[in-house]
Curated annotation (Swiss-Prot):
GO biological process: maturation of SSU-rRNA
Record-stated family: Belongs to the RbfA family.
Recorded GO CC terms: cytosol
Gene: rbfA
Organism: Salmonella paratyphi B (strain ATCC BAA-1250 / SPB7)
Record-given protein name: Ribosome-binding factor A
Known partners and oligomeric status: Monomer. Binds 30S ribosomal subunits, but not 50S ribosomal subunits or 70S ribosomes.
Localization: Cytoplasm
Protein origin, superkingdom: Bacteria
Length: 133
């Protein structure tokens, strides 16, 4: 019987909390000054690598998002050193930051579904008169 949550998932969950605190309190880079949320962390099985997925409050501006990700990549060594102090791990994983567009895509899909439902309701209330010809 497989474990429901293995060690990589537990470490990723704790790391997500710690990175969020570090970004909130320690990172002073103005490129990351916009509200940054850590939406997820994926760990490799050997806990040596971590993919950190982030979203930004001001994510409509693509240039700002790219600059934010670049700033996080440049600060990854500093973030990694703070993680080493906050968490007791034999190997502090190498961090790679990615922009998580799943929230934006989810909102877009939700809007599409809402529009289709609204259009369908309008068709039911006002059937086309052209069918009587």
């Amino acid at each position: 019987m497989a474990k429901e949550f293995g060690r990589p998932q537990r470490v990723a969950q704790e790391m997500q909390k710690e990175i969020a605190l570090i970004l909130q309190r320690e990172i002073k880079d103005p490129r990351v000054g916009m509200m940054t949320t850590v939406s997820g962390v994926e760990m490799s099985r050997d806990l040596a690598y971590a993919k950190v997925f982030v979203t930004f409050l001001n994510d409509q501006d693509e240039a700002a998002v790219k600059n934010g990700i670049k700033a996080l990549q440049e600060a990854s060594g500093f973030i990694r050193s703070l993680l080493g102090k906050a968490m007791r791990l034999r190997i502090v994983p190498e961090l790679t930051f990615f922009y998580d567009n799943s929230l934006v895509e989810g909102m877009r899909m939700s809007n599409l579904v809402t529009n289709v439902v609204k259009h369908d309701e309008e068709r039911r209330v006002n059937p086309d008169d052209s069918k009587e010809d």
